[in-house]
Amino acid sequence: MDAVTVYHGKISRETGEKLLLATGLDGSYLLRDSESVPGVYCLCVLYQGYIYTYRVSQTETGSWSAETAPGVHKRFFRKVKNLISAFQKPDQGIVTPLQYPVEKSSGRGPQAPTGRRDSDICLNAP
């Protein structure tokens, strides 16, 4: 799980919510340990000022799944990264597609698209 850049480990629900609200971007998301269920993770997503939380767990056979909206067929994935990729598409049973990862390692929130690429930025050396 540590290889997943949006995994924040054992942070509180409140800390996760603060990180997401600080972005101000619908579709911002992170993954954290569940505070109430050992061995289960929470996929937290910001949408219209609210944080939506979906439980993510691993089966005994190693597959990953997320609890989504009632009536949505439960899907299983070999890796957490595959689960996240699937939920980046619309109509997957969560409130909004995952768009802006809030990564632990960078210490920064997601960056909104600016229309510029890194290659468009030039630095002038003295």
UniProtKB/Swiss-Prot annotation:
PROSITE patterns associated with the record: SH2 (PS50001)
Residues with N6-acetyllysine modification: K89
Assigned keywords, A-Z: Acetylation, Adaptive immunity, Cytoplasm, Immunity, Innate immunity, SH2 domain
CC annotations in GO: cytoplasm
Keyword Transmembrane helix among record annotations: no
Annotated stretches, region: Interaction with FYN SH3 domain: 67-92
PANTHER family: INOSITOL POLYPHOSPHATE-RELATED PHOSPHATASE DOMAIN-CONTAINING PROTEIN, SH2 DOMAIN-CONTAINING PROTEIN
Tissue/organ expression: T-cells.
Alphabetized CDD domains for the sequence: SH2_SAP1a (cd10400)
Species this chain originates from: Mus musculus
UniProt-reported outcome of changing R78A: No effect on NK cell development, impairs promotion of NK cell cytotoxicity and IFN-gamma production in response to hematopoietic cells
Result, substituting R32K: No effect on interaction with FYN SH3 domain
InterPro entries xrefs: SH2, SH2_dom_sf, SH2_prot_1A, SH2D1A_SH2
SMART domains (alphabetical): SH2 (SM00252)
Protein name in UniProt: SH2 domain-containing protein 1A
GO BP annotation list: adaptive immune response; cell-cell signaling; cellular defense response; humoral immune response; natural killer cell activation; natural killer cell mediated cytotoxicity; negative regulation of T cell receptor signaling pathway; positive regulation of natural killer cell mediated cytotoxicity
